[in-house]
């Protein structure tokens, strides 16, 4: 467990504590209120991986998935025209958040802040000829039974190795989940 001085709270800008990606994932995992899904397409399941490696993920992760094949993706989320697009990301977040509410609201809705993290990424191909970018977002509640909030990012990846792109996506995703819950009242700190 975390020491008392590391309780999950919004921190004032002047005393913003710098935490490692692993520590941020662990903080989320140890908060019994936060519960959600990770749906990642195109650069592995790097964000979910951080939460599993941090420990305690059973209390946070309802489901992870990667609908890598385009036909599977269309069957799950509906057609979007382009697979790496804001439209596809919003479809993913809406579908996954809807499943959380449909399947778990009666059991956990009054005590859980649900979230659906999603990304769709065009990572570096084998020939290193493609534009590397993606969309990443989270749909989340700030309190149990609360309204939904969305944060959506467009990401350009400049690393010229696939492994480095995957690592960057993983770190950015953890920071997005952490920021959504712990820095939502401090936009400047969230962006840093």
Residue ranges of model-derived segments:
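Non-catalytic terminal extensions that flank enzyme cores
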Residues: 9-192
